[in-house]
Amino acid sequence: MKSTLYLSLLTLPMIGFVQAQGQHHLIDELSSKQTALIQATVNSVIAIDENEFVFNNALQNEDWNDFFYRHAPHLLEFKAVILHWAGHASINPKLLLALMELQSSVLSEPSKSNIMLPFGTLSNKAGFAEQVQDLAITLNQRFYEYAQKVEGKVRSSPTNSATSSLISVLIKTQLKPYGSLNKLVGIYETLSNVPLLLSQNKTPAASLNPSNSFYMSFPWPSGYAWYSGGAHSNTGSGYPYSSLDFNNGSGGWGSNTPWVQAAHGGTVTRYSSCNIRVTHSSGYATQYYHMSNLQYRSGDVINSGAWLGRYANNKNQALCQGGQSSGPHVHFSLLNNGRFTSLHNWYISNYRIDVGNSNYDDNCRNFYFEKNGYKTCAWRALYK
């Protein structure tokens, strides 16, 4: 009886509370013909290494200034845009650059026109930043869309989510994209000196269970309560439900927003003035988006509870490289070696998370934080 009453109380509406949530990136659906063509194509090619597809932990240590000086000095002014969207979508920046070179030769033969449209006809957006955002988000969503479809199934071919994601992008402009995929592999390996293909003696990346050496705390001080909406994917649609939007209920744009703490210790990667990641020695990481006043730079090693910065109270700062947000909050995500990872059954400050059945599911029968037998629903006070 106690649990029934408790759930009833927790699902009562809150009066006067600002329910701030984040971005909803929607991409074009593939037609059935395109889907069939992708499947036929990926069955005939060697798989892309998924660890090279994502913004993996090794890449967090890259000297990106040096990389751009050596390979694309004329794109240095766009480095922040590339790293922001590569970091946000967790797509390897070198892969994005290789795809640009494949489509427009913007690295080897830069011009005013191909700098404006670096991905050419792969994107229907106009402008360098707009195309980078579009391709990074599309590659992200296609990658996890395919991962969801094959989860739990026996793989009968070497193909994987990375291969399917790239083919789904290339197929927009070509009937036989595997030729371009082979060219992309060559360009990438020239840029990075690392193989892009999954070798025959290397097993595909697999989803991992929660690590015993990794523990997360809520990103705010002990004794205080913040609020969360339903779990969702990093982009707000699709899969996996890796992200939560936290705020302390202080109000809308222009309000006095609080400082955000690191949920665990580790090494910092700062992608932009509003986007930062902390990578733990276990390989897991948490990412914090819509931030301001960031206190650390890439390479800094911090402890759990370190003050990362505030979540932004200014919409332009919260969306420092574009995107969407309904109000001030921190967009908090879990990753493992660059792959967004479902928060289902993970513990944070000793609360177990049930992610629900859909993006932003705030029905307490589905989404909740559970601690000591009690459930806290979406938009209810979460005490640390």
Regions found by a protein language model. Give the residues of each.
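Bacterial N-terminal signal peptides
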Residues: 7-16
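Zn2+-dependent peptidoglycan hydrolase active-site motif and core
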Residues: 255-295, 314-329
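Short, functionally critical alpha-helical segments immediately adjacent to catalytic or ligand/cofactor-binding
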Residues: 83, 87-107, 135
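N-terminal export signals and maturation junctions of secreted/periplasmic proteins
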Residues: 21-81
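Short glycine/threonine/proline-enriched tight-turn/helix- or strand-capping micro-motif at secondary-structure
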Residues: 226-262
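Acidic, glycine-rich catalytic/binding loops that coordinate metals and/or anionic ligands
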Residues: 214-216, 254, 303, 325-384
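Non-catalytic cell-wall polysaccharide-engagement segments
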Residues: 21-37, 122-229, 366-384
